[in-house]
Design a protein with these regions (language model features):
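S-adenosylmethionine
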Residues: 2-19, 37-43, 49, 59-66, ...
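Membrane-interface junctions at the ends of membrane-embedded or membrane-associated helices
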Residues: 21-23
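Short helix-terminating capping/connector loops at secondary-structure junctions
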Residues: 25-29, 134
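Conserved class I S-adenosyl-L-methionine
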Residues: 28-38
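Short beta-strand element of Class I
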Residues: 52-55
Length: 181
């Protein structure tokens, strides 16, 4: 199932439009990775902003095929399982909702982040360290419906850089960098 753009997708696109131009000035050859590319909306935003080195992955075969048809390099991967190399920007609009037995199996993979909603995010952050350049940034979406993640405990500095209130939840994007030892 290809995850279709929704409020969280539009929030991420807005943040990319705010942040990427400044990062490109510092490094015109920066490498961009999206985990969970879905419909390719963020890949298209990255391309429009002038990023040349765009890579992506998704666990869903249909999403991978769709993004490849759009002209992007996309591989099938469960988080970083099949990813090689380091990246200056890594973005992730993860499945972040707590498990709900009423949700159809067909959509759970795209929306459910585990029993508490944060398990996939934690797994992502544990693996991302091995692929984030020393000065790199992660842009990550979270939801108030999921249990909070202790970013510092996972080795990251975190700054909330954008939020949107919906009638039932608050979506936020965090900019994460490696904690300097």
């Amino acid at each position: 199932m290809i995850y279709q753009p929704a409020e969280d997708s539009y929030l991420m696109s807005r943040i990319l439009k705010e942040k990427v131009p400044g990062l490109l000035k510092l490094n015109p050859e920066l490498k961009f990775l999206e985990i969970g590319a879905g419909s390719g909306i963020h890949l298209q935003t990255a391309k429009t902003l002038g990023i040349k080195n765009i890579f992506s992955s998704d666990i869903d075969k249909a999403s991978v095929s769709h993004c490849n048809l759009l002209g992007f390099q996309c591989i099938q991967s469960d988080l970083f399982e099949n990813i090689q190399g380091n990246f200056n920007i890594i973005i992730f609009n993860p499945p972040y909702l707590p498990e709900d037995e009423r949700e159809p199996e067909s959509s759970k993979r795209a929306t459910t982040g585990g029993k508490k909603g944060n398990e996939i995010i934690i797994k992502f952050l544990e693996q991302a360290k091995n692929h984030l350049s020393l000065e790199g940034k992660i842009f990550l979406i979270t939801s108030s419906l999921a249990e909070d993640v202790n970013f510092s405990q996972l080795g990251y500095n975190a700054k909330e850089i954008g939020c949107e209130n919906l009638f039932f939840e608050r979506l936020c994007i965090f900019e994460l960098t490696r904690e300097q030892i």
